[in-house]
Amino acid sequence: MLKLVKMFSDGSCLGNPGSGGYGTILRYKLHEKILTSGFFLTTNNRMELMGVICGLESLKESCIVEITIDSQYVKQGITNWIATWEKKKWKTTKKKLIKNLDLWLRINAVIKNHHITWFWVKAHMGHLENERCDKIARQSAQSPSVKDFFYENNFYQNKNL
């Protein structure tokens, strides 16, 4: 029988682009784990994606995962756009690579290991876990320690993709 894990995640960026961070809470029964990291130069959407990716990648076995986020970009991307992107070899209608391709490839790989239900909440409306994740993400953005290699090195303009 698969374990039920509840995940809450949020991303933050001080300036966009700017220093950023994510905060993710994983909850299994009475156990809770907090994941966070701060990046020197990134975007808000990348941090929203990173929070979910790192949460899912930290799970050691297949689980039923209920993910609560405030990012329409992530929710729409994963529930509506990703199948089309994959069919079109990750290109937009203008034949350009989608933004944040490195992260969409990671999330696309990791979601296949789990049974996921996605929940969206409006940001800054008092949802307890979303507010906690927002605070954690902002704190990490204020003290970055990691380089967002793909973003900082213009990964998307590299012809050797």
UniProtKB/Swiss-Prot annotation:
The protein's name in its UniProt record: Ribonuclease H
Keyword Magnesium belongs to the record: yes
An individual GO BP term: DNA replication, removal of RNA primer
Domain RNase H type-1: 1-142
Origin organism lineage: Bacteria, Pseudomonadati, Pseudomonadota, Gammaproteobacteria, Enterobacterales
Subcellular localization, as worded in the UniProt entry: Cytoplasm
Cofactor note: Binds 1 Mg(2+) ion per subunit. May bind a second metal ion at a regulatory site, or after substrate binding.
Pfam family, any one: RNase_H
Role summary: Endonuclease that specifically degrades the RNA of RNA-DNA hybrids.
Gene3D superfamilies the record matches: Ribonuclease H-like superfamily/Ribonuclease H
Superkingdom, taxonomy of origin: Bacteria
Disulfide bridge map: none
